[in-house]
Amino acid sequence: MTIQEYKQQLYDACKEHIFLAQQALDRYSTAKTDREREYAKIDNLQHLAAHNALQWALYKASELERRNEQ
């Protein structure tokens, strides 16, 4: 796998987690019980955390790519 392919996979995963975080936020806003809201909030936070970790990995992969080009 090339670094470009790896970066594309990271980017795709970032997009997926943002989509899932938004879905959780939508579930939170339409929740009828405190328990539903709490689960939606937890899901949202987990997807945002995953997105942030993937963004960091994407940044590091880009850094590595730049170093290899020099």
Where do the language-model regions lie?
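Short, charge-rich amphipathic interface segments used for partner binding and complex assembly
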Residues: 13-19, 23-69
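Short, charge/polar-rich alpha-helical segments
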Residues: 1-18
